[in-house]
């Protein structure tokens, strides 16, 4: 490992973790609840608004030639202009359009490819459909420019915990966590990287370097880190295994990204 003073420049990451322990795992559902509530209110206002041309009988109206009392003038309800209702609908939908589009994207459909042809018989093989979308690559690339993340990757010169396959798994985990793009922070990068080392590395000692970089020799913040890691795994539905094929597909999306050069086989 390289030399440096770990735990100093990571104060912002610790402060973010202490300020919001949920780290967006619940914020997405709360936001959706607000959006649905606003939609229900607008729907109720339409149902309760009177329709044009509908009148209700009032006391004193003559029915079958008999009068039930003093007649009162009929007043027709004046409905709201349709243009104002449509405008209010458009205004309410503008704030939630992007989030809903990202949340309710249809699941990828299975893809079949021909594996073998033998005479008139054909054998099909089901191809795996990746759940990684362009916004997940964009979030990952943006986090690579964070000063703490950039310093960590420079610090791990021997690629003990951050080679190209482990970093590919970070993107895969981002695609499964179910968070909105704007909710990802540097702490999510370290949570995903720690989990990737948990899954792939036989030697579990190097992943302790992540703690050493973030918190130094202090053990006070480690229980909180593990709590956030558990929340992160649960948000993925416990789907934490990533195949080598998926890692290579993730790297092929943007092969010129500089982190894909972090190959242990090239170390001398």
UniProtKB/Swiss-Prot annotation:
Q: How does it assemble?
A: Interacts with CDK1. Does not interact with CDK2 in vivo.
Q: Which Pfam families does its entry note? A: Spy1
The entry's keywords: Cell cycle, Nucleus
Summed up, the tissue specificity of this protein is:
Testis-specific.
Q: Where is the stretch described as Disordered?
A: 1-26, 43-97
Q: What segments bear the compositional bias annotation Polar residues? A: 43-52
Query: What family is it from?
Result: Belongs to the Speedy/Ringo family.
**In which compartments does the protein localize?**
Nucleus
What is this protein's name? Speedy protein E4A
Superkingdom is Eukaryota
Q: Which InterPro entries match?
A: Speedy
Could you provide one GO biological process annotation from this protein's UniProt record?
positive regulation of cyclin-dependent protein serine/threonine kinase activity
Give GO MF terms, alphabetically. Answer: protein kinase binding
Tell me which species this is from. Answer: Mus musculus (Mouse)
Q: Where is this region: Speedy/Ringo box?
A: 134-265
This entry carries the following GO cellular component terms, namely: nucleus
Name where it mostly resides.
nucleus
Sum up the protein's function in the record's words: Promotes progression through the cell cycle via binding and activation of CDK1.
């Amino acid at each position: 490992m390289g030399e440096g003073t770990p735990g100093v420049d990571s104060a912002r990451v610790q402060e973010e973790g202490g300020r919001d322990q949920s780290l967006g795992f619940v914020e997405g559902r709360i936001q959706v609840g607000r959006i649905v509530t606003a939609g229900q209110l607008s729907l109720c206002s339409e149902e309760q608004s009177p329709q044009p041309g509908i009148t209700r009988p009032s006391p004193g109206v003559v029915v079958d030639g008999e009068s039930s009392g003093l007649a009162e003038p009929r007043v027709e309800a004046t409905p709201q202009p349709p243009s104002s209702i449509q405008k209010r609908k458009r205004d309410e939908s503008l704030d939630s359009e992007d989030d809903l589009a990202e949340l309710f994207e249809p699941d990828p459909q299975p893809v079949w490819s021909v594996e073998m042809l033998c005479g008139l018989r054909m054998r099909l093989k089901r191809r795996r459909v990746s759940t990684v979308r362009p916004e997940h690559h964009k979030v990952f690339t943006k986090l690579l420019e964070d000063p703490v993340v950039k310093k960590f990757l420079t610090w791990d010169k021997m690629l003990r915990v951050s080679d190209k396959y482990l970093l590919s798994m970070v993107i895969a985990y981002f695609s499964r966590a179910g968070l909105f793009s704007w909710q990802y922070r540097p702490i999510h990068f370290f949570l995903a990287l720690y989990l990737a080392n948990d899954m792939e590395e036989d030697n579990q000692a190097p992943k302790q370097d992540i703690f050493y970089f973030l918190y130094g020799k202090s053990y006070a913040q480690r229980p909180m880190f593990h709590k956030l890691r558990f929340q992160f795994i649960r948000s993925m539905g416990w789907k934490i295994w990533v195949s080598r094929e998926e890692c290579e597909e993730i790297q092929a999306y943007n092969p010129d990204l500089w982190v894909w050069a972090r190959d242990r086989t090239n170390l001398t």
